[in-house]
């Protein structure tokens, strides 16, 4: 009797495993059927719901004429692996790349250049995942939108993302109201991500709605702001966080920062420079070891970071939480 029961039990286990393997096979077939290999230059000018997988070097994908790549799942556009070089993605105004899951655009460790005048978005985290790449270039033009409901541009944790260049004249933002809500994170867990260069031009907006820092940098990186960088959750939250050493932040012209500017405890060589013009007054909420310098020769008042122009009054003791004062 026991032997018979054991045999029935074994048959049921084998049947279960067979059904499971068959289901997995069918799932992979469905996933693969919704993917297109891209081995040469390609233009998309209508709705395409298939994942675009770049399989060769020096491929240029152009999305134009209100065309879109709309992926149900993650990774709407990706390199096939870390050996893929020279990928260029251009998204024209009115066109878009979206996904319902994470990593809308994933570099997979390969080379990638993104020129966006349209929309890159996901309902969850990581509109752009830099995934251990080196030298990625992202240009977000005026009218361009890069957004997520989590960390929006990410090159962190174990993946890093050295020598990333971001030039923004549009909007880069996160709508997440809790944690994992940064607009840009380019710092891995031990702060060895280096060489980031972020320029936020006049009219450019980088902001978030949650508890985390709006922008997070690793080490030996630069951030130049002539637009706006805002932590919309609270002026007590960090707008700019420097996790490592030897970073340089330059705040220019009529640019504003809403939120704290913080260098992490124990870091060295971090610089905060002001270039708002002669006689212009400003006040920033800062913390950590930062070397302050006004490039226009205005006197910098430490405490937070304030400057007074000729004949102006000192703003050092005002309780203004942040921003630029004219």
Segments (PLM) and residue ranges:
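Long, low-complexity, polar and repeat-rich extracellular regions
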Residues: 2-5, 10-318, 323
């Amino acid at each position: 009797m026991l032997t018979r029961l054991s045999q029935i039990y074994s048959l049921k286990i084998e049947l279960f495993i067979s059904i499971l393997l068959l289901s997995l096979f069918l799932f992979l077939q469905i996933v693969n059927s919704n993917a297109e290999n891209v081995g040469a230059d390609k233009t998309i000018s209508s709705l395409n719901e298939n994942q675009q997988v770049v399989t060769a070097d020096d491929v240029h994908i152009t999305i134009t004429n209100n065309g879109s790549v709309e992926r149900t799942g993650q990774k709407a556009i990706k390199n096939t692996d870390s050996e893929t070089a020279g990928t260029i993605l251009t998204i024209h105004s009115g066109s878009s790349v979206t996904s319902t899951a994470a990593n809308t655009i994933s570099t997979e460790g390969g080379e990638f250049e993104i020129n966006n005048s349209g929309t890159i978005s996901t309902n969850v985290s990581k509109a752009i995942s830099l995934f251990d790449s080196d030298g990625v270039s992202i240009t977000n033009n005026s009218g361009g939108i890069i957004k997520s409901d989590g960390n929006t541009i990410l090159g962190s944790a174990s993946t890093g993302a050295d020598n990333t260049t971001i030039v923004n004249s549009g909007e880069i933002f996160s709508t997440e109201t809790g944690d994992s809500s940064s607009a840009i994170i380019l710092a891995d867990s031990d702060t060895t991500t280096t060489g980031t260069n972020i320029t936020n031009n006049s009219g450019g907006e980088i902001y978030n709605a949650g508890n985390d820092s709006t922008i997070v940098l690793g080490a030996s990186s630069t951030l130049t702001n002539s637009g706006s960088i805002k932590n919309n959750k609270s002026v007590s939250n960090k707008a700019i966080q420097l996790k490592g050493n030897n970073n340089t932040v330059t705040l220019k012209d009529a640019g504003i920062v809403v939120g704290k500017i913080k260098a992490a405890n124990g870091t060295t060589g971090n610089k905060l420079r002001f270039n708002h013009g002669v006689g212009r007054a400003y006040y920033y909420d800062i913390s950590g070891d930062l070397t302050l310098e006004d490039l226009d020769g205005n006197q910098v008042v430490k405490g937070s970071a304030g400057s007074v122009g000729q004949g102006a009054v000192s703003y050092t003791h005002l309780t203004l939480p942040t921003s630029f004062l004219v």
